[in-house]
C-alpha cells in the first residue's frame, strides 16, 4: 500500500461527501486507502462515508484523550497500511492531481509536505476571510505548514511516536519533525479549498484555541502577540494569556 488517507470527522455531513469525492479522484492512479474515523457522530456522517466506500471505517464512540481530534488521528494512524500517510480534514477539497504533485516533493530530508489551504469564498464572511488570508504574504512571520492537507512518511511518524494529546497536533508534529533534523515543507503552489461556511463564533473560538495551543506548544507570548498584531487576530494573544493563567 502506497498511500493511506486519514480523514477524521465529528458531525460533518454537510461537507464530508465533497471531501471524500475529491480524495477518491486524487487516488485514482495510486494504490491507496481511505481510513475514516467518525468521532462520536450523531448526524449522517457515517452513512455518507459508507456511501463513498471508505476502505476502513472506524466509529469512535469514546473520548479518552483530552484532545479528541488528536486521538482520532492516532487511531487512524494505527489502522493505516500505507508507506505515506495523508491527513485531509473532512471540510477540505483537494485537486485531482494532489498526490501527483505532493509525492515527488518528498526527497532528501523532506519528510512532510503541506499544501496551501484557502477558504472557499462562498459566503460574505468566507470572502472576508479569504481576503484576510492574504496577510500571510506581508507579515514577518510567514506561513507555517498546516495539517489540513498533508502527506508525511509513515516511518517518520513512527519514529517520533505518532500523534500526541495536544490542541494543535499538526504544529506539534512539525516541531518534533524538525527536532529530528528532518524538514516539513509548505508549498503555496499546491492549493486546496477549505469549504466550511465560516461564522463569527467560529472565528472567535478559533482565535482563542490558537492562542491556547501556542502556549501549550511553548511558543512565547511575544510571538503570539506579534501574530495578533500583524495578522489582525487580537484574541490569539488573549487566548495565550488565558491558558497561561490556568497554569
Tell where the protein language model's regions lie, with residue ranges.
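Non-catalytic, C-terminal membrane-associated alpha-helical segments of glycosyltransferases
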Residues: 200-247
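Short, well-formed alpha-helical segments that are part of the catalytic scaffolds
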Residues: 12-26
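A conserved acidic beta->alpha catalytic loop
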Residues: 38-46
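A recurrent flexible, glycine/aromatic-enriched loop bordering the glycosyltransferase active site
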Residues: 119-121, 134-152
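Short aromatic/hydrophobic "clamp" motif used to bind/position activated sugar donors
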Residues: 85
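Acidic donor-binding loop at a coil-to-helix junction in glycosyltransferase catalytic cores
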Residues: 167-175
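Conserved donor NDP-sugar-binding/catalytic core segment of glycosyltransferases
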Residues: 93, 97-125
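Glycine-rich, basic loop-to-helix element that forms the pyrophosphate-binding segment
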Residues: 62-80
Amino acid at each position: 500500500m502506497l498511500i493511506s488517507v486519514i480523514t477524521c470527522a465529528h458531525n460533518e455531513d454537510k461537507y464530508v461527501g465533497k471531501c471524500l469525492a475529491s480524495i477518491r479522484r486524487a487516488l485514482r492512479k495510486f494504490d491507496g486507502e481511505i481510513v475514516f474515523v467518525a468521532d462520536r457522530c450523531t448526524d449522517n456522517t457515517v452513512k455518507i462515508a459508507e456511501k463513498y466506500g471508505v476502505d476502513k471505517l472506524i466509529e469512535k464512540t469514546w473520548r479518552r484523550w483530552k484532545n479528541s481530534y488528536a486521538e482520532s488521528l492516532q487511531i487512524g494512524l494505527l489502522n493505516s497500511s500505507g508507506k505515506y500517510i495523508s491527513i485531509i480534514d473532512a471540510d477540505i477539497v483537494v485537486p485531482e492531481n494532489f498526490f501527483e504533485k505532493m509525492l515527488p516533493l518528498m526527497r532528501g530530508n523532506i519528510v512532510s509536505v503541506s499544501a496551501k489551504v484557502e477558504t472557499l469564498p462562498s459566503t460574505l464572511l468566507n470572502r472576508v476571510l479569504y481576503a484576510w488570508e492574504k496577510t500571510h504574504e506581508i507579515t514577518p512571520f510567514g506561513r507555517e505548514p498546516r495539517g489540513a492537507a498533508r502527506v508525511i512518511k509513515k516511518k517518520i511518524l513512527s519514529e517520533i511516536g505518532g500523534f500526541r494529546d495536544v490542541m494543535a497536533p499538526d504544529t506539534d508534529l512539525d516541531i518534533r519533525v524538525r527536532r529530528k533534523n528532518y524538514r516539513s515543507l509548505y508549498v503555496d503552489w499546491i492549493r486546496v479549498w477549505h469549504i466550511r461556511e465560516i461564522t463569527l463564533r467560529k472565528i472567535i473560538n478559533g482565535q482563542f484555541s490558537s492562542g491556547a495551543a501556542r502556549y501549550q506548544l511553548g511558543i512565547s507570548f511575544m510571538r503570539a502577540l506579534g501574530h495578533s498584531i500583524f495578522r489582525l487576530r487580537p484574541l490569539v494573544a488573549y487566548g495565550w494569556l488565558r491558558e497561561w493563567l490556568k497554569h
